[in-house]
């Protein structure tokens, strides 16, 4: 969505408007505003929510600020994410704080009272890092810099502190699998076969390796290998040609990515959505997805986070069937959360057919998970209309019937005891 600096894209809505990109000040609603699936409400600092009297009965006692450098406002609660309401935000399309035509951290901080009024528990930020934006920011050119359209590191720090003061946590997308071809690591890696960072990426003289790995973007890529004329070799990429995969068999890469996590967690982030984690490793004779080595590295990431940054969360983005995704919980020692992609289309199927069978079927096929883990459910997010996890027949049905009536989602609500994720501006 293109931001109009003359429009208020983040103010509190009129009573009947659920969208996160609307205008107006929050009037006292006629009745209590309750978000389905809400966790116990957070203490409100600065001003009272319109529905505060209703939420007060479920609110824990006043939370004490933990005396650390991040200035957090939460008691220790390692399972906070299990009932939290997450709200996805694309910075560019949310609110323009400096009048340059692009949403930014200044604008997001300005609208925190609106987000607090909605009753959310955690903001999930889409990619905010320095990037040439060939793939919406999922092509990162500097893991420790903010895209200049969105602001500065100081702006991020100020926003996180302001969110924490309102009892709102913040997580962000982190792409671990690959970088932009503009990243200095890759620029150095491709400069010479003798480069110190040559082994930071997956290079080969033979483009027939890993032939059993599927091509994800078949409409734009004909191979998972691209030829680099600089050194006369092929580099591996599971996504676009301008997103070379990091080589996690190289210990220096593992250390570098752990350093990236520490950088942002030290800044105050409450966790990450780990993008494209099924593809971290490659092995001949496999489809190069969901490999044991990927799980071992994620366990190392989790152990690092638990030891150094308690109460943070790792959310796995693995667009796979539940039997495969459940592996990303490990024994409660890998990711805290994972998306349940197959539920989303079946929710809409059930509403259109006016029967619960599609939802019940996929839930029956969903394995149990450790007690300290949680599925993340969503009706829509930036991966909306993701119909990979349905049959051909179901896909044809969804193409013809998908969300004709927007009231369907209001009828369903979010009634499972799972962590709901909302997306600003997508519920009109």
Across the structure, where does each feature detected by a protein language model lie?
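Active-site and adjacent substrate-binding regions of carbohydrate-active enzymes
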Residues: 2-9, 14-19, 23-38, 42-428
């Amino acid at each position: 969505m293109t931001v109009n600096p003359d429009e208020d894209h983040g103010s509190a809505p009129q009573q009947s408007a659920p969208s996160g990109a609307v205008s107006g000040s929050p009037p006292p609603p006629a009745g209590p505003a309750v978000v389905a699936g809400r966790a116990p409400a957070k203490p409100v600092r600065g001003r009272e929510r319109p529905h505060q009297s209703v939420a007060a009965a479920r609110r824990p006692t006043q939370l004490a600020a933990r005396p650390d450098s991040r200035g957090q406002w939460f008691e220790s609660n390692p399972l906070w994410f299990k009932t939290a309401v997450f709200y996805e935000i694309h910075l560019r399309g949310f609110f323009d704080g400096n009048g340059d035509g692009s949403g930014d951290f200044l604008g997001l901080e300005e609208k925190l009272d609106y987000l607090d009024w909605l009753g959310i528990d955690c903001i999930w930020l889409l990619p905010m890092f320095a990037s040439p934006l060939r793939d919406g920011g999922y092509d990162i050119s500097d893991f420790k810099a903010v895209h200049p359209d969105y602001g500065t590191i100081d702006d991020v720090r100020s926003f996180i502190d302001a969110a924490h003061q309102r009892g709102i946590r913040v997580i962000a997308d982190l792409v671990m699998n690959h970088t932009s071809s503009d990243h200095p690591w890759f620029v150095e890696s491709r400069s010479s076969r003798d480069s110190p960072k040559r082994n930071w990426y997956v290079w080969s003289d033979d483009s027939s390796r890993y032939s059993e790995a599927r091509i994800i973007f078949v409409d734009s890529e004909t191979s998972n290998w691209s030829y680099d004329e600089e050194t006369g070799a092929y580099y591996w990429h599971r996504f676009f040609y301008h997103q070379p995969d990091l080589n996690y068999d190289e210990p220096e890469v593992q250390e570098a990515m752990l350093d990236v996590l520490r950088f942002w967690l030290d800044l105050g982030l409450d966790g990450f959505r780990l993008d494209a984690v099924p593809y971290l490793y490659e092995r001949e004779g496999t489809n190069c997805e969901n490999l044991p080595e990927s799980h071992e590295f994620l366990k190392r990431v989790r152990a690092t986070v638990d030891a150094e940054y308690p109460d943070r969360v790792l959310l796995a983005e693995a667009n796979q069937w539940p039997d495969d995704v459940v592996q990303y919980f490990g024994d409660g020692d890998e990711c805290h959360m994972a998306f349940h992609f197959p539920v989303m289309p079946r929710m809409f199927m059930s509403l259109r057919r006016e029967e619960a069978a599609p939802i019940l079927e996929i839930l029956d096929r969903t394995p149990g998970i450790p007690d300290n883990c949680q599925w993340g459910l969503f009706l829509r997010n930036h991966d909306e209309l993701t119909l990979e996890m349905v049959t051909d027949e179901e896909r044809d049905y969804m193409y013809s019937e998908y969300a004709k009536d927007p009231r369907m989602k209001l009828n369903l609500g979010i009634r499972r005891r799972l962590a709901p994720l909302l997306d600003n501006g997508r519920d009109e």
